[in-house]
Amino acid sequence: VSRITSGIINSFKRSAPKGLKTALWLIKITIPVTFAVMLMDYSGLLAAIAGVTGPWFKYLGLPGVSAVVLITSMFTNIYSVVAVLTLLDLPLREGMILATMCLVSHGFIIETAVMKRTGSSAIGINLVRIAGSIAVGVILNLVMPGSFSGIEKVYNPQQIPFIDAVYGWFSSVSVTVLKIFILVNILLFLQQLMEEFGWIKLVEKPLSPLMKIMGLPRSTTFSWVVANIVGLAYGSAIMIDQREKGRLTKDDAADLLNHHISISHSQLEDPLLFLTLGYTLHWLIWPRVIVAIAAVWFRRLTKTKSVHTPEYVTVN
């Protein structure tokens, strides 16, 4: 009992300062970024950007108004995407293709900051996500039953007073800040607890064959699991801590792990949100996993000989 109690206390002492530091870092990014996006949306700038890119979406079997959804997704989160898709009421096939693309390309500013801190190039990883999003759209347009309806929708968001827009932003960001503070600290405490009692190896060992298939080093296993369960923003504390402790080398994080999780992450909460629109869950998951695996192997095959590729060994 004393060993367990001591382990819990030690885990809390080690995780609390790191959890607070990471949570504050995320919050400092989240508040100004979300406010800027609110201003862009209110001013019509997001819609203007979408209007320029809209015509290209027909090649993915999507109406031009899809650009509004994807651009919104890149700057905001999946909750905003669900809100816009609800307003547009797209045909089911087109909605599912677009939703899966948004599951790849969303929250660019905040999530890119996380991946940059763990060793990736901000520009490079965003290009990977955009390419991955397009690849997912192409795949689904080819294999999903049905075809483009040809129905064009018009995006006419309801105009509200500016003070109401600010209030809506404040309400939303307050909830987000609270979730960041709570989840980041809980996750980091659980990680420290698992390290204290040697439980992380119990997670890594059974997943080792899967990690090899995906082209990922075994040392990335725990961060990969966290990113797939809670996403990049909330899981950032784990990834950053693993990086600082040397369990994730720069090659692991930047060249391999981030290439995968930038395309395929948060496989629980985010896809489930789209069930409210009647979308089928499996279409929202497997295309991202396949494209993410392809992205990692492509990266491994195209790395120059001067860049060391980590072997599948456990980093103690």
Regions found by a protein language model. Give the residues of each.
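Transmembrane helix-loop-helix hairpins in multi-pass inner-membrane proteins
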Residues: S105-I160, L268-E269, F274-S306
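Hydrophobic alpha-helical transmembrane segments
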Residues: I27-K28, M38-A48, A67-V81, G95-A99, G119-I130, S171, ...
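Selected transmembrane alpha-helices and immediately adjacent juxtamembrane segments
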Residues: V1-W56, I130-M211, I290, S306-N316
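Alpha-helical membrane-embedding segments
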Residues: F12, Y79-M101, L127-I139, Q159-V166, ...
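Alpha-helical membrane segments and immediately flanking helix-loop junctions
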Residues: P63-S120, M214-F274
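Juxtamembrane "helix exit" motif at the C-terminal ends of alpha-helical transmembrane segments
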Residues: A36-A47, S80-L85, E195, Q267-T276, ...
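Juxtamembrane/interfacial segments around transmembrane helices
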Residues: S73-T86, S121-V128, S149-P157, L178-N185, ...
